[in-house]
Amino acid sequence: MQFDTIELAIEALRNGESIIVVDDEDRENEGDLVAVTEWMDDNTINFMAREGRGLICAPIDKSIAERLKLQSMEQNNTDIYGTHFTVSIDHYKTTTGISAHERTQTARALIDENTNPEDFHRPGHLFPLIAKENGVLTRNGHTEAAVDLARLTGAQPAGVICEIMNDDGTMAKGEDLQSFKERHHLKMITIKSLVAFRKAVELNVNLKAKVKMPTDFGHFDMYGFTTNYSDEEIVAIVKGDLKSNPNVRMHSACLTGDIFHSQRCDCGAQLEASMKYIDEHGGMIIYLPQEGRGIGLINKLRAYELIEKGYDTVTANLALGFDEDLRDYHVAAEILKYFDISEINLLSNNPKKFEGLEDYGIEIVDRIELIVPETQYNHSYMETKKNKMGHLI
């Protein structure tokens, strides 16, 4: 499939057009027509009904639902994707409520500040959906995508969506969506690309605390951050001037290595070496909650069980059903942007960290190698990192 940029999609939406939004392969793997309520007209709904053929819904943010007292359709929501339907509605000035014009009228009433809760008949022919707070950064659904896109166009947080079905009634996927796009001259994007776009252009980290932190390796300032879309807590330790290509280490949390000094890995030794380097040369260490390359502590221990049976650190992850590396560095990039940093010298042997930061607009000016001694217990691990994961060691 050929996808368009988010910028082109935003422009199309501002022009009153519908676009196609495709979700992930491991989710519904389907495409929805999406339009912004503020920019659409009767033709939008008519096109969705005639060509899309799916259920026409009206994603809105929580504040609109609360203001208009739109209650959940079902208190015990058992939908496998957690789609938050409210009771269906018709605006009181409609007749049957089903025509393209009248569904447009109902959708427009949702964003009219003069609309009152009693202005809707319930049930009706339009199905509002409540988006999760923080949109696709919290839930990668079409509901959240529509509301996020509405905001990105500068409109009120409301849209209309409709699943795309084939002529035979099956759901359009893959090449079917590509043909639909070409036939109707529509822009098409993925929710994944929308997530990446938002992470690249928005600042979603919040400084919660800053303290002096004396350590065995020097005296630092420690900053504590949270994000708008998860319960993660991230710390950054800083020393010296950060203005010109500061030295930065992105360190993934490793309880076994950092705290218990496990010799199965080189994590603890790398953290200590990084702290010594930053103490001497200045810079920052961003400590990321990415235990086990993102699989979590217990799964990392399960991987260790497999390693004891002859697997390596890559094949163990794969055997457990994970990719070899699940880490994403957008939070680190956002923390750097919080400090107005866009160019860094990176302390790392891992090329994926270079790519991960560059994907979010951070330029790597220079690489500072971080070589620590091997132990009798981590030789195989280090060889796997070098030969299978491309680490520069």
From Swiss-Prot:
The name this protein goes by in its record: Riboflavin biosynthesis protein RibBA
Keyword field: GTP-binding, Hydrolase, Lyase, Magnesium, Manganese, Metal-binding, Multifunctional enzyme, Nucleotide-binding, Riboflavin biosynthesis, Zinc
Gene name as annotated: ribBA
UniProt site positions, description: Essential for DHBP synthase activity: H125, E163
Pathway involvement of the protein, from the record: Cofactor biosynthesis; riboflavin biosynthesis; 2-hydroxy-3-oxobutyl phosphate from D-ribulose 5-phosphate: step 1/1; Cofactor biosynthesis; riboflavin biosynthesis; 5-amino-6-(D-ribitylamino)uracil from GTP: step 1/4
Cofactor: Mg(2+); Mn(2+); Zn(2+)
GO cellular component: cytosol
EC id: 4.1.99.12, 3.5.4.25
Gene3D superfamilies reported for this sequence: DHBP synthase, GTP cyclohydrolase II
GO molecular function annotation: 3,4-dihydroxy-2-butanone-4-phosphate synthase activity; GTP binding; GTP cyclohydrolase II activity; magnesium ion binding; manganese ion binding; zinc ion binding
Residues reported in the UniProt entry to bind Mg(2+) 1: E28
Residues of the active site: D325 (proton acceptor), R327 (nucleophile)
Family to which the UniProt record says this protein belongs: In the N-terminal section; belongs to the DHBP synthase family. In the C-terminal section; belongs to the GTP cyclohydrolase II family.
Keyword hit for Manganese: yes
GO biological process: riboflavin biosynthetic process
Binding site for Mg(2+) 2: E28, H142
Catalyzed reaction equations: D-ribulose 5-phosphate = (2S)-2-hydroxy-3-oxobutyl phosphate + formate + H(+); GTP + 4 H2O = 2,5-diamino-6-hydroxy-4-(5-phosphoribosylamino)-pyrimidine + formate + 2 phosphate + 3 H(+)
